[in-house]
Amino acid sequence: MNNIIISVDGPAGSGKERIAKYIAKNYFLYHLDSGILYRRLASKILKNKIDYKNKILLKKFIKSIDYISPRAHKLLRKEEIGNKTSKISAIPFVRQFINFQQKIIVKNMLKSYRGCVIDGRDIGSKVFKEAKIKLFIEVKPKIRAKRRHKQLIERGEKSIYSRILKEINLRDNSDINRKESPLVIPDGAIYIHNSDSFRSTINQIKKALKTI
């Protein structure tokens, strides 16, 4: 089966990227992390000192960009870029631009791969409604916060669990209530519970993808 599109949606910190990478590697698909596109755009905005609150200036700047690279880079994970990303991702014309970029990337990659797996927050509900298989990742906020806290501590970075939990709840509220492409469960989506071990998650994924 070729030209397979699989969407992986879920809230911040739910493990979408890890799950999408696993699917891409084990089912020979191209993986597109939509979050990287937003982070790359945020990085460009910071580098060019564009005031994102000035919508006219921001729209003009975005129109000057032909292509956003989907390649990941550790510098894109900087907190400054993450904060800017969360702000610009709520702007309707920014989301429309990134959605268009995703369409271009997937169209090109389907020429070389048997399919694509894309992770984000509105992939199955908005960007790729035609996805053959739609997954929605579920993890309780407290578990997501604990995982993030542990991750930061292991990196040698300072971390306060209560602060992380608060940020996750705020991000969830923002994603669910934004006007443009809110976080919703796509029609026909298969729930993947990622609160336990990753082995348990893998078993659910294998069951969901048995038709491909």
What kind of feature is each model-predicted range?
Residues E17:
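Walker A/P-loop
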